């Protein structure tokens, strides 16, 4: 991140966001690809295995998404909306004007973080290998930590293209492990839409699949987060099973 902020502060690159992305994303990815080309023929590819593991570990999101919601869950269970708003902004950078919106935003945060830190990375790793997984992670970091609006916009455009296919496949998994009819109604209108963001689609599909009721304070609201987490766990098992079958067929 220091390198990102250093490049953004550069007077020569301040108005050249594409060049910043080339340096931050394309250059490391090309170096990784070259390293794998060199290592793959050696010792039957065993020397490349540690590189795969390191890249995958780096590409996967850090931290426990559900554990990060612990203070919010405690405050919401008590019905303390002020404390819930405080810890949500402090811990996960989520805020809202009302309590109902706050819970909805936290639900969306849970779904999005699980998708972008796990499902999308695993998808691109299995499809195109560590080069694609690293590309996705570096773009995500540029979007999350970039200070230059033009740079963030370009990174978002590229990430939107990366997200288009896996987010729809995950929504389909939601339908298989959750309320199929409800998810189908959501996907019917948004399946081929380029305009809807991955975060919006995963939020709509996840809440529909888990049959999330209107926001409520107290234990009922916390139960909605548990329902979404259980949906994500079931989807992860199906995600792995799908890739396992894919690997066997190949």
Where are these regions (language model features)?
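Hydrophobic N-terminal alpha-helices or hydrophobic patches in metabolic proteins across all domains
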Residues: 1-250
